[in-house]
Amino acid sequence: MKKLCAIFGGNFDPIHYGHINLAEKLAKDISIKKIILLPNNYPPHRKKTQTSISDKIKMIKLAIHNNPLFEISYLETKKNNIFYTIDTLKKIRKKISHLEPLCFIIGEDNLQTFYLWKNWREILLYSHLLIYPRKHKKQKNNELEKWIHSNTVYDCNLLHKQPCGLIFFSDAPCINISSSRIRKNYFYGKNSHSLLPSIVNNYILLKKLYYTNQ
């Protein structure tokens, strides 16, 4: 059975234990051989924060140092460019075999507005969707719900048997840490060392990254 590669995109502003522990849990449960962290400098569906992409990348590198599960992709890091998942997946598929199983990891909260993503139906032509639990408000969209229902599988082993096209809902624990909460903690002088690796905490304090309101 082929092992999966997975892409985990996000702002990572900052990267924290919620990201890292979730990724490691998914890798263990579903036999993911490599997780590619995909920091997005200019996400199309959320407000851009003040942290520079170079600082985000540095924090990611510090957090995953000597962890062979992870690597970083720089495909969505160009300054002032808006990046869309479908375009990034096409670029990634040009670099890896079209026969290699690939997952794109997103939270249930983002799945609720997935129909707003560029060419959202085409994403399954390039990868599976691996959904992790996240608190969210239910949004009704019949077209999206039918699409999810028709492509969802309940056996994670099926993700290894074809390169793309399936949706799988993980039963990983719900993440109760958010980057926005951590940024606010630093702004108000609250300690966040338990929420992220100490080396990342030290970098934030050294650079005074979140001392202005974001």
From Swiss-Prot:
Pfam families: CTP_transf_like
Top-rank EC class of the record's enzyme: transferase
Record field: catalytic activity: nicotinate beta-D-ribonucleotide + ATP + H(+) = deamido-NAD(+) + diphosphate
Pathway recorded for this protein: Cofactor biosynthesis; NAD(+) biosynthesis; deamido-NAD(+) from nicotinate D-ribonucleotide: step 1/1
ATP-binding among keywords: yes
InterPro entries xrefs: Cyt_trans-like, NadD/NMNAT, Rossmann-like_a/b/a_fold
GO biological process, one term: NAD biosynthetic process
GO molecular function, one term: nicotinate-nucleotide adenylyltransferase activity
EC assignment: 2.7.7.18
Protein keywords: ATP-binding, NAD, Nucleotide-binding, Nucleotidyltransferase, Pyridine nucleotide biosynthesis, Transferase
Gene3D superfamilies in UniProt: HUPs
Family matches, as NCBIfam families: cyt_tran_rel, nicotinate (nicotinamide) nucleotide adenylyltransferase, PRK00071.1-1
Protein family membership: Belongs to the NadD family.
Purpose of the protein: Catalyzes the reversible adenylation of nicotinate mononucleotide (NaMN) to nicotinic acid adenine dinucleotide (NaAD).
Protein name: Probable nicotinate-nucleotide adenylyltransferase
Naturally occurring in which organism (per UniProt): Buchnera aphidicola subsp. Acyrthosiphon pisum (strain Tuc7)
